[in-house]
Amino acid sequence: KLAGEKLMPMMAEKTDLAPRLHVLPDFHGNRSPLADPEALGVISGLTLDQSEESFLKLYWATACAIAYGTRHIIDAMNDTGYDITHIHLSGGHTASKVLVKLYADVTGCTVVMSDCEEPVLLGSAMLAAGALDAEGGLARAARQMAGKETTHAPDPSAKADHDRRYAIFHQMHAHRQSLDSMSKT
């Protein structure tokens, strides 16, 4: 939380906080869209600097990498005919203003968050109520039970920097794959 509080003002001043620091976040493999459980994480541009600013830049680059992974999934889905324009976000990521902003800016999607503290549980309750309501069903239950939403639109001024970093993200995937093939005996 402290890192996010320090990063938000920095992100308001410029859209690329670490132009030469890049992360592939696959430290536990890649589930989607590559479906490679053996994929490894990569950090490029790491220095020996131990300052708070250096830590914040690494945190930010890692948060970007998580958002680029989400964009990679959305792009793969859109390439097969979907037209994803909104991300409905719930859970732990909603607590990070940095991630919420990056999801919007990186993907170009509007991020929608329920003001309900537990939106997944609310959705389950809506399904149960809808199943019990023979006349109105799920649609009526959802209308009656839904709370307010908060939306976060992408910042168009961040697009060029994130498009450049996203291209680097893809190049790092290709480099990692090449290095992996050279490393196999």
What are the language-model segments listed below?
Residues 116-124, 137, 161:
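Generic hydrophobic secondary-structure packing signal
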